[in-house]
Amino acid sequence: MREYELMVILNPEVEERAVEPTLKKFLEVVTKENGTVDKLDIWGRRRLAYEIQKKSEGIYAVVNFTAEPQTAKELDRVLSLNEAVMRTKIIRPEEQKIHGK
């Protein structure tokens, strides 16, 4: 199992109260494969540096989770198929890379 950090930008048209349930639905991919969701941090509505899909704002969220590499790939695939998700980025935190060497 490896630690990952996911940053996701959701369409600003998603209701604020629907953000957490929407993310938890996506994160079921991780929990079904015996992974764990360590932290879910919703930053809220922020201005984008440049327009994405003709939108100048997005709802940012950061999720720390532990899973197998193929589970992280599947999560990225599931997120990319959803229209409410504007951008995603999954990385392994720097600290983990240093300790892994």
From Swiss-Prot:
Gene3D superfamilies (UniProt xref): 3.30.70.60
Assigned GO CC terms: cytoplasm; ribonucleoprotein complex; ribosome
Pfam families in alphabetical order: Ribosomal_S6
GO annotation, biological process: translation
Domain of life: Bacteria
UniProt xrefs under CDD domains: bS6
One of the record's GO molecular function terms: structural constituent of ribosome
UniProt keyword list: Ribonucleoprotein, Ribosomal protein, RNA-binding, rRNA-binding
Residues passing through the membrane, by range: none
Function as written in the Swiss-Prot or TrEMBL entry: Binds together with bS18 to 16S ribosomal RNA.
Family that this chain belongs to: Belongs to the bacterial ribosomal protein bS6 family.
HAMAP family documented for this protein: Ribosomal_bS6
Protein name as it appears in the record: Small ribosomal subunit protein bS6
Organism: Kocuria rhizophila (strain ATCC 9341 / DSM 348 / NBRC 103217 / DC2201)
Phylogenetic lineage: Bacteria, Bacillati, Actinomycetota, Actinomycetes, Micrococcales
